[in-house]
Amino acid sequence: MIITPYLNPRLVKPLKWLAIIILLYFLYFSLFSINKKPGKPRKPPKAVENYTCPFEKADFSNFKDKKLEFHKNNGTDPKILVILDSLFSRHGKSIIQILNSQKFAFKAEAISKNLPVLTSAKRGKYSLIIVENYYKYLNMARWNRQLLDKYCKEYRVPLFSFIASKPNDQLKRIRIKGSSLWMWQNQRINRLTVSPSPIHKISKIGAYRNLTTQESDWILFEISENFESILTGTVKNGYERAVVLRDLGREDGVEKVIFGRNLTDFQIKITFLDALWWAMGDEKLFGLDRFVQVDIDDVFVGAQSTRIVEEDVRHLISAQNHFRNFIENFKFLLGFSGSYFRNGDDFEDRGDEILIENAEKFVWFPHMWRHNHAHEHNFTYLESIMVQNRLFAQNMHLPIDYPYAIAPQHDGVFPVHEQMYEAWKKIWNVTVTATEEYPHLKPATGRKGFIHSGIHVLPRQTCGLYTHTQFFDEYPEGFQKVIKSIQGGDLFFTILLNPISIFMTHQQNYAHDRLALYTFENLFRFLNCWTNIRLKWQSPVESAKMYFEKFPEERIPLWTNPCSDPRHQAILPPSMSCSKKSLPDLLIIGPQKTGSTALASFLALHPNVSQNMEIPGSFEEIQFFSGQNYLKGVEWYMSKFPNETTVIFEKSATYFDNPSAARQAAAMVPHAKLVIILQNPTQRAYSWFQSLFQHLIAHKDPIAMSSESLDVILNSTSSESAKFKIRQRCLSGGRYVHHLDKWLEHFSLQQIQFIDSDELRKEPAKVLSSLSKWLDLPEFPFETHIRFSPSKGFHCRLINGKTECLGESKGRKYSEMSQELRQKLDGIFALDNSALFKFLRKNRLKIPDWLEEAVRIRV
């Protein structure tokens, strides 16, 4: 190689590298340009005909503006008893899903020889009875049928039931057993019409549809003066018969609503919903307003050729204006990850620019800068990417009108990633978000809201559209699936069942065939056709305020075990692990002053058993399911069980009579076993008061100073006074069956072990051996590790030859209870003791001697 005199040989090699770099630079950008620009012109969206109401021109003005009517009963709790063919029946699950969606309290039981208890303390326990199978009701054992009918008549409780055709039965016209009502089975109907009835609220009276299917398994009822048609079927010869019937109760005193079809038909399902609100609602609880919010997530995120272009943006603006014909003040909410702005081809980049130019026409909310998954990052990193996204919004003049944000894939919202919540509040001042993951993705009817760390979390809904659904002809399983969802299916009922619906869509659903615009246009048309629902829009902040005013019981989150849900496990922050067991297998739930501390200390002697770490300020108890510690969350609770053994337990005696503990414990540890200690409630109340009294005296509490004895507390009658509240707390733990009912709503009886307090005090080793066997633990010689202490007057642990007894506050002796006070307390607990006796005997459980004696004396 000849080197010119003007070129230093030492520069040749660097210049070669520079030339290569420049070449690669231009090659890269030329290839990048080939991949990205210019974009291919889009085909026009496929034209699909919109839904047309079959009675669009019909005049139903005679039925409008009718005052909504509700059933009135006599002194019953707002709860529903559901008697199912089986707890696993498909139709039964559909009933329960609707009850869950409407937040109705209910008890579901499979039909059996025995009815559940219907009354409590001179009140009816249920405001509505639902029997899944009307044949089972008609053929119920005589005693049970009389008992159920008597309850319904006395408390004016309506009964709902469903009846199905028997396919192989040759009889067509059948008289209902014990009634003048006639029914026709295996029928085919040509038209189904909503009949005038006070039952209807959502259903539009007069609405009808002609049935094109050839199903011939309908049950129809003949209408007479004692029976009113709610939903009417017209058969081929023109006769009209009831498909859903209201029995006015003139013959047997029991008002009924009988369905001649299951909930698979959308008109039947709406009628069932109307009937539920007629039976359980009132003017304050029920409303026809439904608030709809449509979020467009990831407006800049997506692969090239899948994103929106200029024409899509123009159409989006036009559709937003058009949707206001259906929904007052409607606006789309657009979520952004700024890093992906102008990341498409030429046409898509122009679409992004047009969107920014029209930013003021929409409501905007932040995701993460690069669509980051929150659980993978700490506070510092989350803070930095949120700042980047905020700077993008400021530079592009995006109107962030509300403190609302959505985490990509709802990551970090639930299960809670505390550091994301903190970063949200610091950078965006977020007060409202939404997720589809609380408490679980499915069933959708079970989704709820909660408030955590000052952020209101609302339930979010899906609409059957995802990032890959862009063309009518390529929809998975065919687009008929979406049409079915719109026309009386899941999407239609999402709005009916939820006062506030926040829908998740993606920008891809507004490109190409614009499936989202078709979906919501036709959903609104169908709702307008068939229902009296009033669709409205409001800000996320207003929705959060309304939601938690309507459902205040949901403010406190219901923590679940994240390791039991694969979706939750996949988005756990690194600080939480499912690799080891970190939740208890056993809960000793009390009540207080029954020997629960002694039981826990003895059980912990077993080498295969471990207890929670001690918690400062609450003695040895975690008190997670019964106090402020619950707000600290799942991660805090799991951290209190560091030792992995065969059985992990915790003891918190405050759980037993806490109104929320059973529900919260069942959500977190549904398979845990429970131990309840049965102590004479008279003696327990006396010990509880003496312990509290001594504590209050030591702190010179004015209530204690003015209360010379438990007698004074028991005579307190003013429900607002501090003494009365102490009275209620004192007596509460002894009302065993009252509190057991709550625990048995969430745990089976097989999960509960009852221990006699007297037996525990006298023969602790025997009790512990029995408990260990129930827990499937290896045998352990408790008798050699527990010794009676004459000086203490109770049994203590024996560790390495030394006696270890409980502290001074445990096992203390109090002055003898007076006979007069004992009789007063015995009288107060008489009914509770009787109920406990019956409960134990009915379930063939051991009855303590003190209970046998208490019931014998009363008799």
Curated annotation (Swiss-Prot):
Pfam families membership: HSNSD-CE, HSNSD_N, Sulfotransfer_1
InterPro entries for this protein: Heparan_SO4_deacetylase_dom (IPR021930), HSNSD_N (IPR056793), NST/OST (IPR037359), P-loop_NTPase (IPR027417), Sulfotransferase_dom (IPR000863)
Coiled-coil parts of chain: none
Topological domains annotated Lumenal: 35-859
Entry's Gene Ontology cellular component terms: Golgi apparatus; Golgi membrane
GO terms of molecular function: deacetylase activity; heparan sulfate N-sulfotransferase activity; hydrolase activity
Job description of the protein: Essential bifunctional enzyme that catalyzes both the N-deacetylation and the N-sulfation of glucosamine (GlcNAc) of the glycosaminoglycan in heparan sulfate. Modifies the GlcNAc-GlcA disaccharide repeating sugar backbone to make N-sulfated heparosan, a prerequisite substrate for later modifications in heparin biosynthesis.
Protein name: Bifunctional heparan sulfate N-deacetylase/N-sulfotransferase 1
Organism annotation: Caenorhabditis briggsae
